[in-house]
Amino acid sequence: MKKLWQNCHIATMQNGQYSYIEDAAIVTEGHLIHWIGKQQQLPTDTYSETVDLNGAWVTPGFIDCHTHSVFGGNRSVEFEKRLQGVSYAEIAASGGGIASTVRATREASEEQLLNSALKRIRCMQQDGVTTIEIKSGYGLNYENERKMLRVIRQIGEKLPMTVKSTCLAAHALPPEYKDQSDAYIEHICTEMLPKLHAEGLVDAVDAFCEHLAFSPAQVERVFKTAQSLGLPVKLHAEQLSSLGGSSLAARYHALSADHLEYMTEDDVKAMAASGTVAVLLPGAFYLLRETQYPPIESLIKHGVRIALSSDLNPGTSPALSLRLMLNMGSTLFRLTPEQALAGVTIHAAQALGLEQTHGSLEQGKVADFVAWDIEHPSEIVYWLGGDLPKRVVQHGQEVIF
């Protein structure tokens, strides 16, 4: 049955621009957009329900394309340490950082991980997020990576959201492989990834390319394994130093390379040539009080698509509002509100390989949208905090919170 959503204005975000339709209407059928356009051009038809959106501005549902939403415990004590002058690298070297979350995650049951993650993700959902990517990477052995990935699949079953699962086994070195990073990479490639993929738990493969994690050569071994399994790749790259990880990601036609504070112009050119999306993570940049900015002007000049994401994680970005990340992306990185909104809609969809079905409001795409009680889409980026009045529609059905 067809449902009519009328009396609205639309920022479709096609081609990464507002692409306005004023005095508009949307017709949904099931979970898809059947028709979209100006109200006066609405085809004559019979509708099972008509919804008055009261002059709202409608945008695509937000896509949070880089999160670590499933984890045990939290790291508020480390937050204090960093404010006392201890660096992220020093915390990691002393057994904190990712290692402390690994311990807490291994100790937690699937049910505990699921319940804590659902609380966080419902906050994101109320902020307008309709699609989310979630990484493993706090288990670091087969049993616990599998546990995390199973929880991610359960989240997709529990919530009316699109949930994409990324295996980030190459996130850090587990304690049982201390000083044996090559052996751990071999274990990931020969044991973990093939088994997890065979169970249908993995949509993409990620790794952390950094001096305190894994080298480009080690990451390439993971990428080759993912490629052999037919899985797309992503990469944490150039967050703390320049190792050429983003160029490596480009060589493997990665969906995205993420963080990118220390990338060079050669890296930018490589990503532009491969179509790899640059995912910027202003929450981590802000919380770590970084001073090295991603090369925004170069990315724009060379036509690299820019996405924004929360990087929701317990250590460096405990961010429960993607809308706040929009403001940070504009304020810290000088993105325009239009560029920021593209970063959590169509460009974020491209970072997940979902651009054919999600990320913009077009006929035939999934009916995920948010109707905002605002006077212009830039307000979504402009207002800091609070809960902007909105109606969230997922797969053609309004979500009641």
UniProtKB/Swiss-Prot annotation:
Keywords: Cytoplasm, Histidine metabolism, Hydrolase, Iron, Metal-binding, Zinc. One of its GO terms (cellular component) is cytoplasm. 4-imidazolone-5-propanoate binds at R75, Y138, H171, Q239, T316. Catalyzes the hydrolytic cleavage of the carbon-nitrogen bond in imidazolone-5-propanoate to yield N-formimidoyl-L-glutamate. It is the third step in the universal histidine degradation pathway. This is Imidazolonepropionase. Its cofactor is Zn(2+); Fe(3+). N-formimidoyl-L-glutamate binds at Y138, N313, G315. Fe(3+) binds at H66, H68, H236, D311. Binds 1 zinc or iron ion per subunit. It is found in: Cytoplasm. GO terms for biological process: L-histidine catabolic process to glutamate and formamide; L-histidine catabolic process to glutamate and formate. Coiled coil: none annotated. Belongs to the metallo-dependent hydrolases superfamily. HutI family. Zn(2+) binds at H66, H68, H236, D311. It comes from the Bacteria. Its EC number is 3.5.2.7. The keyword Oxidoreductase does not apply. Pathway: Amino-acid degradation; L-histidine degradation into L-glutamate; N-formimidoyl-L-glutamate from L-histidine: step 3/3. GO terms for molecular function: imidazolonepropionase activity; iron ion binding; zinc ion binding. It catalyses: 4-imidazolone-5-propanoate + H2O = N-formimidoyl-L-glutamate.
